[in-house]
Amino acid sequence: MNGAELKQKLMAKAKEIGIDKIGFTTADPFIELRERLKESQDKGYASGFEEPDIEKRVRPEHSLPEAKSIIAIALAYPSKLKNPPRSEPGAYRGIFCRASWGEDYHHVLREKLTLLAAYLQELVPKARTQVMVDTGALSDRAVAERAGIGWSGKNTSIITEEFGSWVYLGEMITDVYLPPDTPATDGCGDCTICIDACPTGAIVQAGQLNAQACIAYLTQTKGFLAEAYRTKLGNRLYGCDTCQTVCPKNRKIHFDHQAAFQPDPEKVKPLLKPLLHMSNREFKEKYGQMSGSWRGKKPIQRNAIIALGHFKDQTAIPDLIELLMNDPRPVIRGTAAWALGRIGGQAAEEALRQAKGKEQAEEVLREIDKALDMAHAG
Ligand code: B12
Ligand code: SF4
Ligand code: SF4
């Protein structure tokens, strides 16, 4: 069977196993990406979550010797919640980004790619394959762009004609030759809506992100969140969708045919207060299947505290005092102090003063002092 015939068969199989979009490219090095990754590292824009070895990232043969082709796939995920529960005074809610709705996409895409790889091996028994989703060495976006899945938007997301940017990406490298597709071309034109809408100015120029300033990244950090960003976080518990929700290419785009990505509204828009006292076990049981739980419960709890401060939720004061006084984690005590300072009031101020008398950790004491100033000024 020649490459073109193989490709046709793979495309038909992909459809059968529920892959929404498939594209093909060569395993040639990603030359342009090399410069971009280098610049991102040099300027301190990288998140640190990506593979640090640039050569591994741009040369597919580092992942699979004698690589010849890459098969890129995309799966669409929903952008809207049916009957979303509403935040109400005293019962405020946080939000997980859409890429964390439903089952963890890593498993779902990997499973489909593994089925596709098995099929290729049926057709070409000597074929070798390497499957990747997010955590692999390659840039999933650079692969998708070159394989014609979608163009690289100014917000850095891959945007497909059919599903907008609400797609997960993954790929399979193989040593089998498959004719490449045409790379996607820019569809943003003069638009700059995402750049203007980004709350932290993290899109430093069209297509280039300073991940260190991106809320999606900041929600995943484990330490204290720099003060300047706390008020920008809003009620985000994990990730940030702003530069995608504002994008005109996503207007009216909502695909919920992938059963695995159906969100449970109570999980993706949970009440904030119950999150504060969750045990590790409860957290794992409730959120363990979501991709947004990969950093554990601490960042989510820290962000929940910030969200309560953002809403100035008076009814959260007793919970926040409890954390300030008794939580063993300095980041949680210090962030609770910040939230109490923001909410203000006599009970908050008194608790902060009391905590100041017994707190040992320098960084928490600094937060308490600032919070007392804030409570006083407010
Ligand atoms: C590290 C990482 C992050 C970091 C950094 C993101 C970033 N933009 O670099 C953080 C934590 C911030 C993040 C956030 C998100 N991520 Co993320 N992330 C990754 C990861 C693991 C590596 C990305 C990377 O290498 N970045 C470094 C840059 C330099 O590389 P790159 O983005 O791949 O480069 C492309 C473009 O950015 C562009 N580019 C880069 N530099 C420059 C410079 C110029 C001048 C120009 C014009 C273009 C350009 O060229 C490349 C080809 O398209 C990938 C998975 C993977 N292995 O690739 C997922 C991935 C990119 N993330 C994904 C998702 C869904 C998200 C979020 C939407 C989740 C959320 N809702 O919070 C946000 C989006 C934030 C944003 N504006 O990008 C999806 C993207 C799907 C899509 N449709 O594009 C991926 C592909 C995971 C997956 N397999 O589905 N992510
Ligand atoms: S994900 Fe949020 S913070 Fe990051 S670039 Fe987009 S709008 Fe800005
Ligand atoms: S908002 Fe505009 S510039 Fe940004 S990604 Fe969408 S189309 Fe491109």
Enumerate the language-model features and the residues they cover:
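Auxiliary alpha/beta "docking" domains used to position bulky ligands
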Residues: 1-187, 360
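Amphipathic alpha-helical scaffolding segments comprising HEAT/armadillo-like alpha-solenoid repeats
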Residues: 282-286, 313-325, 345-357, 378
